[in-house]
A protein has these predicted regions:
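Positively charged, solvent-exposed patches that mediate nucleic-acid binding
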Residues: 1-117
Length: 117
């Protein structure tokens, strides 16, 4: 139940974030889109294609590190639906570089959210 709650799962949920994103972090390694949701917690969705990252090992690593960076950040306390889209550069990054980049960019998202609009 907790796992289902914390993930953007359906096509409708993904479309809502794409169509109505309020927050956007455009890094060379990935794109982070987010929109406010009606919950008291964040939900995370990830998109990493075979074209972007040909090997399943690298795709799964990207997903694992994204979930880890999400858990370590304070994003789970903010009511957002978040999608992280992998780009080709993620394929060439080390674990450490990818985790650091995700951590920094999740912090930028937190800062954007905290800024009064």
């Amino acid at each position: 139940d907790q796992l289902e709650r914390s993930h953007v799962l359906t096509a409708r949920e993904f479309s809502a974030v794409f169509d109505q994103n309020s927050f956007r972090i455009n890094a060379s390694e990935f794109l982070i889109l987010a929109r406010k949701n009606g919950f008291t917690f964040s939900r995370l969705g990830m998109i990493i294609s075979k074209r972007t990252t040909p090997t399943s090992v690298k795709r799964n690593l990207f997903k694992r590190l994204t979930r880890e960076a999400f858990r370590q950040s304070k994003l789970n306390q903010i009511p957002l639906d978040i999608i992280v889209l992998g780009r080709p550069k993620t394929n060439k990054m080390t674990k450490k570089e990818l985790l650091e980049s995700l951590t920094v960019n999740f912090q930028l998202l937190i800062d954007q959210w905290a800024k009064p609009s």
